[in-house]
């Protein structure tokens, strides 16, 4: 909290707050809880379209899938905790987002985990990577919610740090919707789940400042995961919701009981009384302050009518969950805490829930600049990029996740997007994307590119995009360059979503991601939902005897590319998003899939065309011959054509008889070769640039465990 904020609080209250009141105010006025630095910009984002039932403002967003089914989606970060204690930090990140979905009245059905680390050469980064993955795997597997996709990337700027974002999706029937706020006084507040301990005390305050070198001291701010209680909480909560007697529901995440109760009561102008001494404790001798701001996990707060308390309580007892009435809602908009009969806090509730925004100084920076494309042999360029940890298969990661529990997973990890079966005819596509290298060079274009890539990934599995959520990972907003990059990012996210007719239904902002004065790159992560006809999903890999077509225009855009990163080249221009072309190509590919004209589709993104072709060869265990000189392009340099990361592009493989019909769907569309054989062959004007057996490509592609010191 800043000195001017403390002064404002004293003025509005007309007195000095006591220790408990200061603790609650510090939690609620933290960046993590209040979004005080991001709110002025987030209002630029579009939040409504024909699919949106509920936009931002509650624990998760809701999208209409069909008349019987609504989809609930949210995304969260657990960056600071995971950097300090990777296993517990990542596991509790999963638990928190699952409860966000649950408290809308939905059953969580799938997770995505976009995760980022420093270079794997360093032991500390390998340790963070292995234990973050283990934390996500253990928690998700034990609660029975499959992790079906995500991203795993490595970057110098994250040395000794980690970004752990987790998205979750759930499904519900419309009649089971429960809001996170009350609309009447006199409701009883029931706390259910785990006992309250000292873990996570000051967790949101810890998440609202930079990490120091001595991170071990911060371990007490990391919460302790208990997936077995969470599993019981999921089933008990849904059973309680299905009675129709739950009036409001919130999970206890950041800010603990203070945040959950004040937000639940204050949203519509009511107040709350909390009897903190009734809270079941895990540790003896806890103070009212510790009880009110503890972030112990696996806890939910229910609001029910007094006459329904026993019925709801019986459901919790069936699941052997401890529950207690810890307070009630009141007409007067105040937040009052009692401890053993004594009033120990009494604040106007809006002082907790309506935090003034802060607009920091904005200072543009320029990281872009003209750079000569290095003169590098084609084979060396390909080997560098194909062998990059960012390009390698993440099978080592997702094989630790039970991605098939619940039996809905139609498309498994490794494809452009995951697909989950919702009914016999339709599936839900779910994907997350971001590119910090592009965002660092040009935050506006990088953000637009993240949205465009999400759309391409959804389209590549035949899905019509429905809605988006965003997770914005940045360094300190007090740095003028960082705050400018944040504002530019939000502008890019807004413009791209509007162009596609998409809305953001939920999101998360994580500031202060830096270690010892070293800020991370701007890292917006966008997750998208789409609706797909199950029988129309194309393959992601090649099969024998098909033509290979490239959709879209390739430009000499190597700035922020995987090739430049591997060669250590800085600068260049980030790829520019042409929204009209992006939209037209997406519509064309969707139409081609609907008409059954294409067998396989893959979008072109990180690593460029060469990587996309090689991935399709490995996925289908089938070779190809492709002449890159035929690619629709604004450059005649083979390196630029092969490794540029221009947007708006797809590779399609299809039977020759569909060629004429396909040509009519696109402005830029050219046949560059054929599938077949056991080698991947790249040509330029008929001359061979590179020939690699698909078996060799596959061996390299699956070599991530070797970088971790594990033998296959």
Swiss-Prot record:
CDD domains found in the cross-reference section: PurL_repeat1 (cd02203), PurL_repeat2 (cd02204)
Keyword Isomerase in annotation: no
Protein name: Phosphoribosylformylglycinamidine synthase subunit PurL
Catalytic residues of the enzyme: 32, 78 (proton acceptor)
Keywords: ATP-binding, Cytoplasm, Ligase, Magnesium, Metal-binding, Nucleotide-binding, Purine biosynthesis
Coiled-coil stretches noted in the UniProt entry, renumbered to this chain: none
One of the GO biological process terms: 'de novo' IMP biosynthetic process
InterPro entries found in the cross-reference section: PRibForGlyAmidine_synth_PurL, PurL_linker, PurM-like_C_dom, PurM-like_C_sf, PurM-like_N, PurM-like_N_sf
Keyword Cytoplasm: yes
Highest taxon above the source species: Archaea
Assembly: Monomer. Part of the FGAM synthase complex composed of 1 PurL, 1 PurQ and 2 PurS subunits.
Pathway: Purine metabolism; IMP biosynthesis via de novo pathway; 5-amino-1-(5-phospho-D-ribosyl)imidazole from N(2)-formyl-N(1)-(5-phospho-D-ribosyl)glycinamide: step 1/2
Organism field: Thermococcus gammatolerans (strain DSM 15229 / JCM 11827 / EJ3)
Compartment list: Cytoplasm
Enzyme Commission number, as recorded: 6.3.5.3
Biological function: Part of the phosphoribosylformylglycinamidine synthase complex involved in the purines biosynthetic pathway. Catalyzes the ATP-dependent conversion of formylglycinamide ribonucleotide (FGAR) and glutamine to yield formylglycinamidine ribonucleotide (FGAM) and glutamate. The FGAM synthase complex is composed of three subunits. PurQ produces an ammonia molecule by converting glutamine to glutamate. PurL transfers the ammonia molecule to FGAR to form FGAM in an ATP-dependent manner.
Reactions it catalyzes: N(2)-formyl-N(1)-(5-phospho-beta-D-ribosyl)glycinamide + L-glutamine + ATP + H2O = 2-formamido-N(1)-(5-O-phospho-beta-D-ribosyl)acetamidine + L-glutamate + ADP + phosphate + H(+)
Gene transcribed to yield this protein: purL
GO cellular component entries: cytoplasm
Binding site for Mg(2+) 1: 76, 508
Chain sites annotated for binding ATP: 35, 470, 507
Family per similarity comment: Belongs to the FGAMS family.
Entry-linked Pfam families: AIRS, AIRS_C, FGAR-AT_linker
Binding site residues for Mg(2+) 2: 100, 251
Enzyme superclass (EC): ligase
Main location: cytoplasm
GO MF entry, a single one: magnesium ion binding
